[in-house]
């Protein structure tokens, strides 16, 4: 029999082993769909971003009007812009659900895969941040000013670092130019790290909802999971297109319809919704350096999760106490997101402080303690 080109060709062989003949556990649920959805999000963002970059001008006097020009005069420019802006939101929705799945089912015990995933999250956050500055509206400018200014809290080198990042003494033309360069570059860096992420995952194979070895029962990725992923894609595409076509500005800030003005500060400076949980944690500490450290810790804490796993069972499937804590953590993050969008006044200050405290408490002490308790209860 003639050799199958899919299995013998050096390039096709890699694709085949990753997406076609890949042995996959027979019982992975829809929670395992988000990896492929994230890949689709990245591809969409790169494509729409490339088309937008063709019409964008990275200059303070032209940036705002170039975006307006794209929406008004370019064929389907409004659609490309709406898909790109709302695609970012769906990218974050998918990555949050993907991380939540990892926490619930103990996927973080594949340490290399988990760590590359955390690096991907950080790179994505950086990309989204620099991208938000590009339309050069009021919230773009002031959001960029406030967040970059946080680096000045670093002792001794802080102020120098901020001025170096800005390319001057305030957010101005050099800042916009370099942010555009970074925003163009970073998605390709994300694509590269994604390949590494996938490579580490395929070393061990996927985890499954039971958290036990699935070597005894594997099925080929195609047609089973390729079809399942297409269904997941259709289910994501529906709300995504509904949002982008019916209310494209729902998640945006009205302030961004006003061109950037360094002389007028908006009443409430806040980032996009997907950063609000971290922003709430930053604001809950009445000290600049402390707030910056808490902000960094709120994401970097994910790197500690594999070391805080004390249960003898991998997943939370059969651990009701840990499940309760997990959903408490989810509710807590939703509260933080809401508080981050509110002004800094009573009662939001105290709610934010309590939610920030419980966020770290649940992750650092309650989950490991409850894991140990469940071991005892099961006579492990």
Curated annotation (Swiss-Prot):
Cofactor: how and how many bound: Binds 2 heme b groups non-covalently.
Any single biological process term in GO: mitochondrial electron transport, ubiquinol to cytochrome c
Residue positions binding a ubiquinone: 202
CDD domains membership: cytochrome_b_C, Cytochrome_b_N
Keywords: Electron transport, Heme, Iron, Membrane, Metal-binding, Mitochondrion, Mitochondrion inner membrane, Respiratory chain, Transmembrane, Transmembrane helix, Transport, Ubiquinone
Transmembrane segments: 34-54, 78-99, 114-134, 179-199, 227-247, 289-309, 321-341, 348-368
Superkingdom to which the source organism belongs: Eukaryota
Positions with a binding annotation for heme b b566: 98, 197
Other remarks in the entry: Heme 1 (or BL or b562) is low-potential and absorbs at about 562 nm, and heme 2 (or BH or b566) is high-potential and absorbs at about 566 nm.
Locations listed in the record: Mitochondrion inner membrane
UniProt name for this protein: Cytochrome b
GO cellular-component term (any): mitochondrial inner membrane
Membership in a protein family: Belongs to the cytochrome b family.
InterPro entries linked: Cyt_b/b6_C, Cyt_b/b6_C_sf, Cyt_b/b6_N, Cytb/b6-like_sf, Cytochrome_b, Cytochrome_b_C_euk/bac, Cytochrome_b_N_euk/bac, Di-haem_cyt_TM
């Amino acid at each position: 029999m003639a050799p199958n080109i899919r299995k013998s060709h050096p390039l096709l062989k890699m694709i085949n082993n990753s997406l076609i003949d890949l042995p996959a556990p027979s019982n992975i649920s829809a929670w395992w769909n988000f990896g492929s959805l994230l890949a689709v999000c990245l591809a969409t963002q790169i494509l729409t971003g490339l088309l937008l970059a063709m019409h964008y001008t990275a200059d303070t006097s032209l940036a705002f009007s170039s975006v307006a020009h794209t929406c008004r005069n370019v064929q389907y420019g409004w659609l490309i812009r709406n898909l790109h802006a709302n695609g970012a939101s769906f990218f974050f929705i998918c990555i949050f659900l993907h991380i939540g799945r990892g926490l619930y089912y103990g996927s973080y015990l594949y340490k290399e895969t988990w760590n590359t995933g955390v690096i991907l999250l950080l790179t994505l956050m950086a990309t989204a941040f620099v991208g938000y500055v590009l339309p050069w509206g009021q919230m773009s400018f002031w959001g960029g000013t406030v967040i970059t200014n946080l680096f000045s809290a670093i002792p001794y080198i802080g102020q120098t670092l901020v001025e170096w990042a800005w390319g001057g003494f305030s957010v101005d033309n050099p800042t916009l130019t370099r942010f555009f360069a970074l925003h163009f570059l970073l998605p390709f860096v994300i694509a590269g790290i994604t390949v590494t992420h996938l490579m580490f995952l395929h070393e061990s194979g996927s985890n499954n909802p039971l958290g036990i070895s699935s070597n005894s029962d594997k099925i080929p990725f195609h047609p089973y999971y390729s079809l399942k992923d297409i269904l997941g894609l259709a289910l994501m595409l529906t709300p995504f297109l509904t949002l982008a076509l019916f209310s494209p500005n729902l998640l945006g800030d009205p302030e961004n319809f006003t061109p950037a003005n360094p002389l007028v500060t908006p009443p409430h400076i806040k980032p996009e919704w997907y950063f609000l949980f971290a922003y709430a944690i930053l604001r809950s500490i009445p000290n600049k350096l402390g707030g910056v450290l808490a902000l960094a810790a709120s994401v970097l804490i994910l790197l500690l999760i594999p070391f805080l796993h004390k249960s003898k069972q991998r997943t939370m499937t059969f651990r009701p106490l840990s499940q309760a804590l997990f959903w408490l953590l989810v509710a807590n993050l939703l509260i933080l997101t809401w508080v981050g969008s509110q002004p800094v006044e009573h009662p939001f200050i105290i709610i934010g402080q309590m939610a920030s405290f419980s966020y770290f408490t649940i992750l650092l002490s309650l989950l490991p303690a409850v894991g140990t308790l469940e071991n005892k209860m099961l006579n492990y």
